[in-house]
């Protein structure tokens, strides 16, 4: 039987309430999200070519405050570097591709202007996932329309988090 959204929600709840460190739970949540994204019935029920651009909540666990969000991006679209503050996120692509970049801040956080350099680039193709712990800087790029599931540890729009501001911050390329 195919892995379902309900099973995924039960699994992430169990992982997050098991007492194990978040650093151990997040990769396992990412594995379970991959299982869900490899269920063609889930993908077909959640996304179609007519699904409007934007974000919608598929599930919210009030005990852990985890959100399972479905995103449709109308590419090409390139996001700026950001993190999820004290929370975390797991990204997974259902259809198309999400190009990810991970960043490192090269100057102290006490300085107002952030100086970032890229440390990793990779593609999340259908079924692939990646977990980003608290404070991990990353950015997304969608070369075309993309259908993505994002799981967050809370409502990340309601907490302080870093967002790259091009008028203030800068990016340096590695030599």
Language model feature labels by segment:
Residues 69-84, 123-124, 133-135:
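Conserved short histidine dyad/triad with adjacent acidic residue
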Residues 46, 50-75:
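A short glycine-rich, His/Asp/Glu-containing loop-to-beta-strand
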Residues 79-82, 100-101, 132, 137-143, ...:
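Short beta-strand His + acidic residue motifs that chelate non-heme Fe in jelly-roll/DSBH
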Residues 1-40:
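N-terminal leader/capping segments at the start of a protein or of a new domain
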Residues 90, 145-160:
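A short hydrophobic beta-strand segment most commonly corresponding to one strand
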Residues 75, 86-104:
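Glycine- and acidic-residue-biased ligand/ion/polar-headgroup-sensing regions
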Residues 90, 105-137:
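Short acidic-glycine-tyrosine-enriched beta hairpin
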């Amino acid at each position: 039987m195919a892995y379902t959204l309900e099973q995924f929600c039960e699994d992430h709840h169990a992982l997050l309430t098991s007492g194990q460190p978040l650093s151990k739970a997040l990769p396992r949540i990412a594995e379970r999200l991959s299982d869900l994204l490899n269920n063609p019935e889930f993908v077909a029920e959640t996304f179609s070519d007519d699904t409007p651009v934007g974000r919608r909540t598929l599930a919210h666990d009030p005990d852990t405050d985890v959100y399972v969000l479905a995103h449709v991006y109308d590419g090409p679209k390139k996001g700026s570097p950001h993190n999820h503050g004290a929370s975390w996120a797991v990204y997974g692509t259902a259809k198309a591709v999400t190009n990810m970049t991970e960043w490192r801040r090269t100057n102290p956080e006490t300085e107002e202007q952030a100086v970032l350099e890229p440390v990793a680039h990779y593609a999340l193709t259908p079924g692939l996932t990646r977990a980003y712990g608290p404070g991990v800087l990353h950015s997304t790029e969608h070369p075309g329309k993309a259908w993505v599931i994002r799981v967050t540890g809370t409502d990340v729009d309601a907490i302080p988090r870093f967002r790259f501001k091009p008028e203030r911050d800068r990016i340096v390329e590695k030599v």
